[in-house]
UniProtKB/Swiss-Prot annotation:
Keywords assigned by UniProt, alphabetized: Ribonucleoprotein, Ribosomal protein
Gene Ontology terms for molecular function: structural constituent of ribosome
Name this protein carries in UniProt: Large ribosomal subunit protein bL28
UniProt superkingdom: Bacteria
Gene3D superfamilies assigned: Ribosomal protein L28/L24
Region (Disordered): 1-20
PANTHER family: 39S RIBOSOMAL PROTEIN L28, MITOCHONDRIAL, LARGE RIBOSOMAL SUBUNIT PROTEIN BL28M
């Protein structure tokens, strides 16, 4: 399963672990993704999204209908 937020588009970024001796080893910083079901009252159905916690805050602020319309406008199947 890909580590990409469906709402914000957040994806893993790469960086370094740093030891006390400042040795660098490559690592991935993963987004805080959650699988969450939202009830869409206008469609009378549940929609399951894989979104970051920032995406959940966006849905809380703008509403699920607005976010779904934006996703469908970008061609995301929901």
């Amino acid at each position: 399963m890909s580590q990409v937020c469906q709402v914000t588009g957040k994806r893993p970024v790469v960086g370094n672990n740093r030891s006390h001796a400042r040795n660098a080893t490559r690592r991935r910083f993963l987004p805080n993704l959650q699988s969450h079901r939202f009830w869409v009252e206008s469609e009378k159905r549940w929609v399951k999204l894989r979104i970051s916690t920032k995406g959940m805050r966006i849905i809380d602020k703008n509403g699920i209908d607005t976010v779904l319309a934006d996703l469908r406008g970008r061609g995301v199947k929901v």
